């Protein structure tokens, strides 16, 4: 539709302005781009993670706990050892939970309510890629949580077709170039049998899948 065409044009313009260009392998290897860890051994950046499971199995609670440690800089236990956490902003893009439900889940993990490092955008749509890039430039989050893949897609695509994964390919391709490097966790619901839901292109588009 017209909105999708406009979004695609804006995306192409952003990539053009960022200077996508031909380079030699030598020039590529000399780039200062590196992968850092926000939480050592768990959350690298730039990185895109798909977290999937059945409803009510704690996917959201897991991500809120990770978010709490990043927003506050509190050490995180990794393999029985407390590891330092790089403190920074957290951006939650919510298309799945009601505001009341999200508040209750935050309370369950003792999320610090006076923390000004965490930003929530309700009724998010993955089709708003240009707005996403603006938010990334403005907030520069260490962690982005998208809850959930289907909830933020708004029925725009058939989840069994490869087009459904296009926004995830954009995240992986542009992370650290079109917008500041970050860790993106995308929550995805399993099918009624507990298996993976939707096209296999979803898993192919991300850096890692957690189940």
Language model segments and positions:
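N-terminal pre-Walker A segment at the start of P-loop NTPase domains
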Residues: 13-38
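Short regulatory helix/loop adjacent to the ATP-binding pocket of P-loop NTPases
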Residues: 103-110, 194-205
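Substrate-engagement module of ASCE P-loop NTPases
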Residues: 164-190, 208-211
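Hydrophobic anchor at the beta1->P-loop junction of P-loop NTPases
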Residues: 51
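Conserved inter-motif catalytic segment of the P-loop NTP-binding fold
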Residues: 26, 39, 54-57, 75-173
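Walker A (P-loop) ATP-phosphate-binding motif of ABC ATPase nucleotide-binding domains
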Residues: 48
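Hydrophobic positions on the alpha1 helix immediately C-terminal to the Walker A/P-loop
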Residues: 62, 66
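Short, small/acidic-rich helices and loops at N termini and domain boundaries
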Residues: 1-17
